[in-house]
Regions:
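Compositionally biased, intrinsically disordered low-complexity segments enriched
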Residues: 18, 46, 126-127
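A solvent-exposed, acidic/Ser-Thr-rich amphipathic alpha-helical stretch
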Residues: 6, 30-87
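A beta-strand edge to alpha-helix "cap/lid" segment located at domain peripheries
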Residues: 3-4, 8, 64-132
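Residue-level detector of alpha-helix boundaries and kinks
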Residues: 1, 12-13, 44-47, 51, ...
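Hydrophobic pocket/interface hotspot
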Residues: 16, 28, 36, 59-62, ...
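Short, low-complexity N-terminal intrinsically disordered segments enriched in polar/charged residues
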Residues: 1-35
Length: 132
């Protein structure tokens, strides 16, 4: 299959991002496979890298991290910049607004997804930075 802006994998990834960015954690959870891996990185030194293996740490650990993150995200602030994918791979680029208490900031994200044969997210790689 060729790379498309609205491929099957893009639709799954987009639905998961739309869910968590609107604080719908139940819908976000449904999209994640039981053997998923998550890697989060940024070049900003004050934010630690995150690596989670759901089959080792459990979906509850993944969801606890996601819930902690989305508490600061402003619902409805998702702005998609680009999306490409095929049947199993998706690449999304977007921003969300977040408020960490001192001021609202913009989180610029690029997320790479790999889906399993059941169309669930089995690998997610997040690269982001915070901008005021």
């Amino acid at each position: 299959m060729t790379v498309q802006k609205d491929s099957p994998a893009v639709r799954v990834a987009r639905a998961q991002v739309e869910a968590w960015s609107n604080h719908d954690l139940a819908a976000a959870r449904v999209a994640v496979a039981g053997n998923a891996t998550l890697a989060v990185t940024t070049t900003q030194a004050e934010t630690p890298a995150v690596n989670t293996v759901v089959s080792t740490t459990g979906i509850e650990d993944y969801m606890a991290g996601l819930e902690n993150f989305v508490k600061s995200v402003t619902p409805g602030s998702l702005k998609e910049i680009a999306a490409l994918g095929d049947d199993r791979n998706a690449l999304l680029m977007f921003t969300v607004e977040a408020d960490y208490g001192s001021a609202k900031v913009t989180l610029a994200n690029t997320r790479l997804y790999l889906l399993d044969e059941d169309h669930k997210i089995m690998a997610e790689q997040v690269v982001y930075f915070v901008s005021s």
